[in-house]
Amino acid sequence: WRVIYVEGGPFSDYQRIFQGLALGLEERGLIENGHVPLPKDSEEARGMWEWLHQHAGGKRLVFLADGFYSANWDSQQREKVRQEVLRRIREKKDVDMVLAFGTWAGQDLAAQDLPVPVIVSSVTNAVDAGIIPSVEDSGRDNLVAPIEPDRFKRQVLLFHDIFAFQKLGIAYEDT
């Protein structure tokens, strides 16, 4: 399977999720080496992609050398990336699977009728973002967008189990 990576822009959470994905692929025998190092002092995942291209090994998955796409949080670049990825999948036909990291990438690829699997990761709420229609079903046989509706409730309960707090304050930025 020839794989590409698409993101809206660099984000440190993508690195950790991508690293966990690589380790899971190794654990399941899909690649030989999933021990991709996290970049220091950077939120970029491109270096991780390049590392996997060179070191993942195995015969099942190929991380395409030119298969890393990022819009760098630029809305004009986002459209260019979307068009380039769609053209590559539909016309060049050298992609068998897409890893879409974040809301932008998930929205841009979920809305398309693509002939390849799309795995969406690191989206706070894929239903609210319009990536999938419901928690029960992505609406497309080739689209996976994991969602955990009670995530924040579970986090607070876990935090309470650990620290047994009596009062809880929440700091947030009203953006």
State the predicted function of each range.
Residues 1-175:
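Short hydrophobic alpha-helices and adjacent helix-cap/hinge residues
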